[in-house]
Regions:
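A beta-strand edge to alpha-helix "cap/lid" segment located at domain peripheries
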Residues: 1-5, 51-128
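Short acidic-aromatic low-complexity motifs
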Residues: 2-28
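Small-side-chain structural scaffolding
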Residues: 10, 16-18, 33, 38, ...
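A solvent-exposed, acidic/Ser-Thr-rich amphipathic alpha-helical stretch
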Residues: 22-73
Length: 128
């Protein structure tokens, strides 16, 4: 698929999540899609499991993309996630698309942390 269509698929996915329109969110995935969370060692296989996880989610985040990069059938999103608890999370999502829908999503996320004092003399501070 053209890169602009792949980007639009991921943008609709984010829109669905942010609007709590899970039908729109799930429509962007293939039924046999896989979601992987390497940090927690989890893999969600297939639409039935994905719908169950998101249906049971105690508090879906609002996703604010900071950057979206597209290369062929791969879309990478750097984002800030707000779970409504006052703590922003930083995340990177790697979406692999097939025929205009997500076939695989790999997600990494963390909360901001204090910079180490030992390297302060060599770095510049940036806004998270």
């Amino acid at each position: 698929m053209p890169e602009n269509e792949n980007r639009q698929t991921v943008e609709r996915l984010i829109q669905g999540l942010n609007e709590r329109n899970l039908d729109l969110f799930h429509a962007q995935f293939h039924e046999d899609s896989v979601m992987e969370y390497p940090q927690s060692g989890e893999r969600i296989v297939g639409g039935e499991n994905r719908r169950a996880v998101y249906g049971a989610f105690p508090g879906l985040p609002t996703v604010t993309p900071r950057r979206i990069v597209v290369s062929g059938d791969v879309v990478v999103v750097e984002a800030v996630l707000d779970y409504g608890d006052g703590a922003d999370w930083r995340a990177v999502f790697i979406f692999e698309l097939r025929d205009g829908k997500v076939a695989k999503e790999t997600a990494y996320w963390t909360q901001p942390f204090e910079a180490a004092d030992w390297r302060a003399q060599w770095v510049e501070r940036i806004d998270g």
